[in-house]
């Protein structure tokens, strides 16, 4: 088994047979079946409406931040669509996971490993450059716009108001 999730199902139901618990190994590449969730859109959408892609990414960043700050509530939501046994099990599975989308070197490497496997097995027909395909400009722009908005909001909070002044 490549994840604790399937190990739990196997233990609870006996429907899945574990051959090896790869989560015991320190090498993260052995657990690449846990490829990070990939957010995609069509090439046409990216070219014709980049502002919509950036707006969507801003929403995904906000959702990730919320999930990081509210892991129990996030676990309750995610439990409805995962293979975990229950909300507590889901929480244990996500409590150390950063839910904010990112294009870290490790995430790109994990996607590359998954892509190479799917290419070798014939699930995808055309090879491609994962770093270029990831289109980092959308996530970067979304992060920049969110930061600019947060800075502007903080500046506005520091401006004194004239409310309540007499004379």
Predicted regions located by residue number:
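Conserved C-terminal helix/tail region of periplasmic/extracytoplasmic solute-binding proteins
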Residues: 119-167
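Short, structured secondary-structure boundary patches
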Residues: 20-22, 39-43, 109-111, 142-151
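Secondary-structure end/capping motifs
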Residues: 47-125
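Residue-level preference for alpha-helix termini and adjacent loops
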Residues: 38, 44-45, 98, 102, ...
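Pocket-lining segment of extracytoplasmic ligand-binding domains
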Residues: 1-81
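Short secondary-structure boundary/hinge segments and terminal tails
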Residues: 8-10, 27-29, 96-98, 134-138
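Short loop/turn and capping residues at structural boundaries
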Residues: 21, 89-91, 129-130
């Amino acid at each position: 088994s490549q994840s604790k999730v399937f190990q739990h199902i196997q233990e609870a139901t006996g429907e899945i047979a574990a051959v090896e618990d790869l989560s015991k190994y320190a090498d993260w590449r052995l657990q690449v079946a846990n490829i990070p969730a990939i957010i995609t859109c069509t090439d046409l959408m990216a070219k014709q409406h980049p502002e919509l892609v950036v707006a969507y990414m801003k929403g995904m960043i906000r959702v990730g931040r919320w999930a990081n700050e509210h892991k129990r509530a996030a676990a309750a939501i995610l439990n409805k669509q995962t293979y975990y046994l229950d909300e507590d099990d889901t929480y244990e599975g996500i409590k150390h996971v950063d839910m904010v989308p990112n294009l870290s070197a490790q995430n790109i490497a994990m996607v590359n490993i998954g892509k190479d496997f799917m290419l070798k097995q014939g699930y995808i027909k055309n090879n491609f450059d994962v770093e270029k395909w990831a289109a980092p400009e959308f996530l970067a722009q979304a992060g920049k716009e969110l930061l600019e908005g947060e800075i502007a909001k903080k500046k506005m909070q520091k401006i004194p108001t004239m409310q309540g002044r007499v004379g």
